[in-house]
Amino acid sequence: MRQTVKGCAVTIDQVSKAYGHCLAVDRATVHIRQGEFFSILGPSGCGKTTLLRIIAGFEQPDSGDLTFDHVSVLGVGANKRRSNTVFQSYALFPHLSVYENIAFPLRLKRLSKNLIRERVHEYLHLVQLDEHLHKKPHQLSGGQQQRVAIARALVCEPGVLLLDEPLSALDAKLRSNLLIELDTLHDQTGITFVFITHDQSEALSVSDRIAVMNKGKILQIGTPYEIYEQPATDFVAKFIGETNSFLSTVVSCTAIENEEFMLSLQVPELDRTLTVTADNPIDPGRRVCFTVRPEKIHISLEEPGTTSAPLNVFRGFVEEPVYAGFQSKFFVQLESGAIIQVFQQHQKYLDTGPEIAWKDTVYVSWSAHDGYVVEDIES
């Protein structure tokens, strides 16, 4: 790159958008920092694409404000904003070559032929398509077509690049490779990336921060670590990755060291109480959602011994073992009838005894520090 492009800071302030009686975006507020790789993550129909279209200028909000670098762009047409969009469908001109597709927006700006040539070759090199400049879109693979679409969106050097689920039409391996390339492009250009996806692994692997949406609302904004390890609502806990969640009632709350609190929870589905640490005190009697990730649960054929840290131990049997490459997934039915999911590397890699098999009686356990309590119960 000749020089790093200055990305835009984007602020969405109390933005709402309805289609008839359907509220697609409900008072969304988020500040996207200059040069950030920011993902908007949520299930189909949650409003994330509508929000992206509002940023792009394809839709106008019913209320609220939208600013680029602290200047409102409401009423400013899509072609006048410092943003470009990469669509899921690529939207390439089938009769134009790779070179001509990328050059098209520069020609609309009436730049000189020399500058167009220089800029197109620069971005062709950036997306590793130097050898394909004379090919038509139908002569390219899906991944190559998507690279052309990305180069065309970047060649005008916008302040914001909007990516509307750009990888969803590609196979898993190609998605993984292009995701790495997108992250590299972001680092090389300095442009603000706003990435729309329903795929949690995509968002977690490349984002500086993530906004999780559901039913038109932004439920949580945070780093990938915060979203995964410290979910703000039970929906976020269940939607991001896989987890075991149980509605619970706080029985007691005791202050412990390191400014933490030890909670005792009554969990009807498990038919007993369990312990979990929390950063903040929670009043006894409060209904909460307890969650523990499958990879944080230990599974064994023998009952665990006593430990210095409080340990939650349950007995059950393996209802279904699932081979998943480097690890196994176990669905364990506890004595209460509840099902708990456990992830563990294969026993042969761990060298900790015989493989656990279907119908084996097992013990599942986790430390009080490995669970998490969510106070905001949405679902």
From Swiss-Prot:
Main localization is: membrane
Per the record, membrane topology reads: Peripheral membrane protein
Keywords associated with the record: ATP-binding, Cell inner membrane, Cell membrane, Membrane, Nucleotide-binding, Translocase, Transport
Molecular function per GO: ABC-type putrescine transporter activity; ATP binding; ATP hydrolysis activity
Give the first-level EC class, as a single word.
Answer: translocase
**Compartment(s) where it occurs, according to its Swiss-Prot or TrEMBL record:** Cell inner membrane
Known Gene3D superfamilies for this protein? 2.40.50.100, P-loop containing nucleotide triphosphate hydrolases
Family note: Belongs to the ABC transporter superfamily. Spermidine/putrescine importer (TC 3.A.1.11.1) family.
Name the record gives this protein = Spermidine/putrescine import ATP-binding protein PotA
Organism (species): Treponema pallidum (strain Nichols)
Lineage of origin: Bacteria, Pseudomonadati, Spirochaetota, Spirochaetia, Spirochaetales
